[in-house]
């Protein structure tokens, strides 16, 4: 385990790409122990000059879309291209143990054994916001360790699409054709955040369904406002199982990066993501500090009960809480 005495040496080993040190650094960053958090802050500050040169990808999709099969095929393609690949898999968590249920390593056999790959599951513990914070910090560790591509993967439910899109360069939505899932994706506003839509499982007797779904997505994209002026989102198809169409997806990602880098937009996006991350973390820290105050916690619960019982309007409750905070912290 990394400690104060070994921090400098651990940073050196991390910069050399030592997998064991990377795993230890991730464990340190994930720890909620106050001493570990203070040490991980020093670690993250020290590696920041070495971050920013990695391509950050987000991959999301509903259960059954074949994300693990796709990531296995895609990751192995990148390795054959001479690149180092890290996968950060934000998994659903066991409500009992808080641990990862799916265990992505067991579903990506070849990739997990590859020397140029690193896979790390991040249990969400039922709260995606906290998981996305850790995923962002783990991504920075991978960048400092010299990984060329970092992929953040999550289940496409709830707010997961926007959470992932806010921390990556290129956001990829993995879909399947048939069963109404294609239309459902359009209704969810998925099109507003996706840079690439990939329809998987274009194999067997599914070619017709895939072609219909592709036309549907392309039609929707043409009537929606672009996320970036420099980029028209593309709809691609593949069979991750048969490893077909994977190289076209990589070429499209390169086109995306080239277009946004040339205009300076990619740098702007990353800067804005950092600002939003700081703002969100500030809000969470302030709330944690407030609720750690027993007087505020008690007053909040009393106010909440009054609002529940309709003896106090939410607006008045908010005003009273604001006045309480003003008295406690600013007067």
Question: What function would you assign to each model-found segment?
Answer:
Residues 22-24, 237, 248-326:
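Long, well-ordered amphipathic alpha-helical subdomains in the mid-to-C-terminal portions
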Residues 106-107, 183-188, 223-227:
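Short beta-strand/turn micro-motifs at beta-sheet edges
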Residues 62:
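P-loop (Walker A) phosphate-binding loop of NTP-binding proteins
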Residues 6-57, 65, 71-160, 167-174, ...:
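Nucleotide-state-sensitive switch-loop elements of NTP-binding domains
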Residues 196, 202-259:
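Canonical P-loop GTPase G-domain recognition
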Residues 10-11, 65, 122, 199-203, ...:
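Short hinge/gating elements
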Residues 179-208:
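Flexible active-site lid/hinge loop adjacent to a nucleotide/diphosphate
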Residues 101, 138, 163, 167, ...:
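Alpha-helical scaffold elements adjacent to nucleotide-binding pockets in ATP/GTP-utilizing enzyme cores
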